[in-house]
């Protein structure tokens, strides 16, 4: 039988196809091995992605626009022009001094404030406790561990009381109850710092009588408050009047200091939450982030007290544990009230996204990440 011979053109075409297939297989093999190596090198198992690359610079620009803060600042300047007329004469000078200092710090955005929080928050507390006034062992040291206890009704579904009380510092929000038989096993009994927004301060202080009923945890527990209304410097002056910080000297009979958050910390928290809210809006609606303001009352939008308490704790603690943040359909909004609805001026879902990043990938957080703030965040854990 005669053997069949392929023509030269057919042989050439077959050879070209074979070479092409070999090259394709080789290239795919290279890509596969390269991808495996990148995944092994990436801390999150991804293909070598840097968390910081997730930051959307356009959202960063939009987050810097804060009409609510601008309105508060303008109102503060008008109060200064009017010499804070609502303040009783005996407290006016102190209130004006605090207001002037606060307004003077409003002009610049500085994430580096995170590195100053030990000096701004912990140092006054140490001085009050007699631990930080003379270069002692505790001076300049961060708290070894901090528990930030929120007010969510989900706290009643667990018994974290002993775990909470085991932290060096326990922070509670807006005078939520603790320590009695009803709540202690859920929320703990100890309190080392009360974090109040100034609306709460304004409701429990009576300037005309020079009375302050804001110390829900006792005279010896310091208060950290952020000013959402500049007029509340009057209530601050009243409540801080009996503290040692008002005289600048330690006094065993004096009440603990009432510390006002640095405006740079306020601005940092505002930008972080607005960034996450913008991102969530664009993702869920498919609309440009520039339309965010149409769906929110931009002049009222604000971060929650709990969010700022967590960020403040991250600045003064080596390890932060967070309890009572989150919601459940069967739980109250607050464990100690009958309120079931969230406040519209907060975007809690956006804050929850921030908390997830804070716990698992802090370098993905704009403004707060180390490359922006120069500050290395401590480990933060959230308990349900």
UniProtKB/Swiss-Prot annotation:
Any single GO BP term:
protein glycosylation
- Source species of the chain: Oryza sativa subsp. indica (Rice)
- Predominant location: Golgi
Q: Which residues lie on this side of the membrane: Cytoplasmic?
A: 1-5
Any Gene Ontology CC annotation: Golgi membrane
Q: What does this protein do?
A: Possesses sialyltransferase-like activity in vitro. Transfers sialic acid to the glycoprotein asialofetuin. The transferred sialic acid is linked to galactose of Gal-beta-1,3-GalNAc through alpha-2,6-linkage.
How this chain sits in the membrane, per its record, is:
Single-pass type II membrane protein
What is a GO molecular function of this protein?
A: sialyltransferase activity
- Signal sequence coordinates: none
Protein name per Swiss-Prot or TrEMBL: Sialyltransferase-like protein 3
Enzyme nomenclature, EC number? 2.4.99.-
What's the name of its gene? Answer: STLP3
Q: Which residues are glycosylated?
A: 241
What does the sequence similarity comment in the record state about its family?
Belongs to the glycosyltransferase 29 family.
């Amino acid at each position: 039988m005669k053997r069949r011979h392929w023509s030269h053109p057919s042989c050439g075409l077959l050879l070209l196809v074979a070479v092409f297939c070999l090259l394709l297989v080789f290239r795919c093999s290279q890509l596969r091995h390269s991808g495996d190596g990148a995944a092994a090198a990436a801390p999150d198992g991804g293909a070598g992605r840097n968390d910081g690359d997730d930051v959307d610079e356009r959202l960063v620009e939009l987050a810097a626009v804060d009409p609510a803060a601008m309105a508060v600042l303008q109102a503060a300047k008008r109060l200064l022009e009017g010499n804070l007329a609502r303040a009783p004469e005996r407290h006016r000078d102190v209130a004006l001094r605090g207001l002037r200092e606060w307004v003077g710090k409003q002009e610049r955005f500085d994430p580096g404030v995170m590195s100053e929080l030990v000096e701004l928050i912990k140092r006054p507390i140490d001085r009050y406790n007699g631990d930080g006034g003379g270069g002692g062992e505790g001076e300049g040291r961060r708290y070894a561990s901090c528990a930030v206890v929120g007010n969510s009704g989900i706290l009643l579904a667990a018994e974290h009381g002993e775990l909470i009380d085991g932290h060096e510092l326990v922070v509670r929000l807006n005078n939520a109850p603790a320590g009695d038989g009803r709540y202690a096993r859920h929320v703990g009994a100890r309190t080392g710092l009360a974090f109040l927004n100034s609306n709460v301060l304004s409701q429990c202080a009576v300037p005309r009588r020079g009375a302050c009923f804001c110390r829900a945890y006792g005279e010896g527990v310091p208060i950290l408050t952020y000013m959402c209304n500049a007029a509340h410097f009057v209530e601050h002056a009243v409540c801080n009047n009996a503290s040692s910080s008002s005289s600048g000297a330690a006094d065993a009979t004096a009440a603990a200091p009432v510390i006002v958050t640095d405006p740079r910390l306020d601005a940092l928290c505002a930008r972080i939450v607005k960034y996450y809210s913008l991102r969530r809006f664009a993702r869920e609606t498919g609309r440009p982030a520039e339309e965010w303001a149409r769906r929110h009352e931009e002049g009222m939008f604000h971060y929650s007290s709990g969010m700022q308490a967590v960020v403040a704790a991250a600045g003064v603690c080596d390890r932060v544990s967070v309890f009572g943040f989150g919601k459940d359909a069967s739980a109250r909004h607050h464990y100690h009230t009958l309120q079931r609805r969230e406040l519209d001026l907060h975007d809690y879902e956006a804050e929850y996204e921030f908390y997830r990043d804070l716990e698992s990938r802090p370098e993905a957080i704009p403004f707060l990440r180390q490359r922006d703030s120069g500050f290395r965040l401590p480990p933060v854990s959230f308990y349900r």
